């Protein structure tokens, strides 16, 4: 059975994921950071991990990026072979989601469109897009800012 997915949903999800990935660690990563600080033997190492933990808390509380280098948006899509997209181009929807996420999230724009010309796109597009076709009728999306 074919399932129709609106590209506006993909765009909105990617926008939100760009903002979230730059402001918060996933719960498992946040827990790993706490464990690393607790298990660290070196006083200097403990202090540095404590500063990183404080940075994470400030970023979440004040809605500022965890790191000033918000990097390139790398988008991973697993698309079920029973999925049909409506509403335009998948690549354009992904890039528009990245554009909106980086603009609305007040994230640093540092991507160049052509590496030889070195002109900043001012919206962090184009995204690096990895697509995998899988069985089923679902779309799984992951966004990783790579700074």
Question: Across the structure, where does each feature detected by a protein language model lie?
Answer:
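Non-transmembrane, aqueous-exposed alpha-helical and coiled segments at domain scale
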Residues: 1-147
């Amino acid at each position: 059975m074919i399932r129709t997915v609106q590209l506006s949903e993909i765009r909105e999800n990617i926008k939100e994921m760009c903002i979230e990935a730059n402001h918060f660690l996933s719960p498992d990563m946040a827990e790993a950071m706490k464990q690393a600080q607790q298990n660290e033997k070196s006083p200097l190492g403990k202090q540095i991990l404590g500063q990183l933990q404080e940075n994470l808390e400030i970023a979440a509380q004040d809605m500022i990026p965890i790191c000033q280098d918000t990097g390139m948006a790398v988008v991973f899509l697993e698309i079920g072979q029973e999925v049909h997209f409506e509403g335009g181009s998948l690549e354009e929807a992904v890039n528009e989601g990245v554009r909106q996420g980086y603009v609305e999230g007040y994230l640093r724009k540092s991507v160049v469109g052509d590496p030889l010309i070195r002109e900043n796109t001012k919206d962090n597009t184009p995204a690096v897009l990895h697509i995998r076709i899988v069985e089923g009728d679902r779309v799984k999306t992951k966004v990783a800012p790579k700074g």
